[in-house]
Amino acid sequence: MERVNVVGAGLAGSEAAWTLLRLGVPVRLFEMRPKRMTPAHGTDRFAEIVCSNSLGGEGETNAKGLLQAEMRRAGSLVMEAADLARVPAGGALAVDREEFSGYITERLTGHPLLEVVREEVREIPPGITVLATGPLTSEALAEALKRRFGDHFLAYYDAASPIVLYESIDLTKCFRAGRYGQSADYLNCPMTEEEYRRFHQALLEAQRHTPHDWEKLEFFEACVPVEELARRGYQTLLFGPMKPVGLVDPRTGKEPFAVVQLRQEDKAGRMWSLVGFQTGLKWPEQKRLIQMIPGLENAEIVRYGVMHRNTYLNAPRLLGETLEFREAEGLYAAGVLAGVEGYLESAATGFLAGLNAARKALGLPPVAPPEESMLGGLVRYLATANPEGFQPMYANWGLVPPVEGRMGKKEKRQAMYRRGLEAFSAWLSGLNPPLPRPEAALV
């Protein structure tokens, strides 16, 4: 059997390689460190954690908690390492960085079916390949991707607006409309002059996230953060993302002084983004400001806005829910490159890409988890989200169908957690060949 290529030994690549090895498929794992380091990494270890050491909140009311549980059920190497290297962090799963990456490196390099190649990959390798090169993908490989799929399908920075859960929006304070009577695809949150004045002042006073040196970027005029627009003058936002021109509030028959527009992000209409509100503000500040917007006082934020260096694909244009490229059979993407955010999400997509690469090598059809599971919801978002202005995503409850019946928020989340884990477990049990138990991958 020919070796399957895995490019990149971060969390996604490590999990992809491990999944392939568990199914008896030989792997050639490419990692350019230490021959060529990135601005963010400091070692040559696999799955090096370079930012926060947290893999997200735990528990049955947390979306990341469901993804953690699914990955444990799947026999994830990343979750195995996280559980062994965990440190006290309240309700979150945090790890000792060195112990975590050291454990993963040792487990992988000790496997007889793994070949490690310490060199930069400058072209897409022939044969079955998983690309998991992360936010700091080398320029040469990025250029190769552009030549293959078009430069408009690859982004070099992440300028994302916050996304809120539709069910948490107060629709009595909003109206549906498009500008000048066009299709009513947008939700509009109108503001009075006094509401706008307070909102503008709060934007000026809000604290910004301080990026790492390697995250810093030059602003493109089409993607200036909303707080920077506010600094340019009192009226700048009124001629930009908050302009009311062509939007008539049916309750007053007039254009409001200012308006915040929301656009549907997923086919099911569960998630809506604030149009033109890309931001680098700290998350508590984002929450405070969003709750100043009429109709969003109690909005549940499922994804905060970000502004940072990030190389990722326009997944809805290029990938299916199996993480295989639509126009390149046997080529898969995982992790940040595939359009997810977060350590856990990267590892989870690495698992699925590795699983389907293994099935390809074994002559079997691809598979995808059920939509009720967090991983299933995540990859369906990647495959079906609006490709115009596509934003990377992390685990959140807006990715999975809501549960029926009247219940409180906590009970609803617990019901979604149990339903998702049950569906994911049933899917795992139905895989043929089955995934070996984790210890069975050891030789």
UniProtKB/Swiss-Prot annotation:
PANTHER family: GLUCOSE INHIBITED DIVISION PROTEIN A, METHYLENETETRAHYDROFOLATE--TRNA-(URACIL-5-)-METHYLTRANSFERASE TRMFO. It is an enzyme of class 2 (transferase). It holds the Pfam family GIDA. One of its GO terms (biological process) is tRNA wobble uridine modification. PROSITE patterns: GIDA_2 (PS01281). Gene3D superfamilies: FAD/NAD(P)-binding domain (3.50.50.60). It catalyses: uridine(54) in tRNA + (6R)-5,10-methylene-5,6,7,8-tetrahydrofolate + NADH + H(+) = 5-methyluridine(54) in tRNA + (6S)-5,6,7,8-tetrahydrofolate + NAD(+); uridine(54) in tRNA + (6R)-5,10-methylene-5,6,7,8-tetrahydrofolate + NADPH + H(+) = 5-methyluridine(54) in tRNA + (6S)-5,6,7,8-tetrahydrofolate + NADP(+). NCBIfam families: gid_trmFO, PRK05335.1. It is found in: Cytoplasm. This is Methylenetetrahydrofolate--tRNA-(uracil-5-)-methyltransferase TrmFO. It comes from Thermus thermophilus (strain ATCC 27634 / DSM 579 / HB8). One of its GO terms (molecular function) is flavin adenine dinucleotide binding. One of its GO terms (cellular component) is cytosol. Keywords: Cytoplasm, FAD, Flavoprotein, Methyltransferase, NAD, NADP, Transferase, tRNA processing. FAD binds at G8, A9, G10, L11, A12, G13. Belongs to the MnmG family. TrmFO subfamily. Its cofactor is FAD. Transmembrane segments: none annotated. The lineage of its organism: Bacteria, Thermotogati, Deinococcota, Deinococci, Thermales. Catalyzes the folate-dependent formation of 5-methyl-uridine at position 54 (M-5-U54) in all tRNAs. Its EC number is 2.1.1.74.
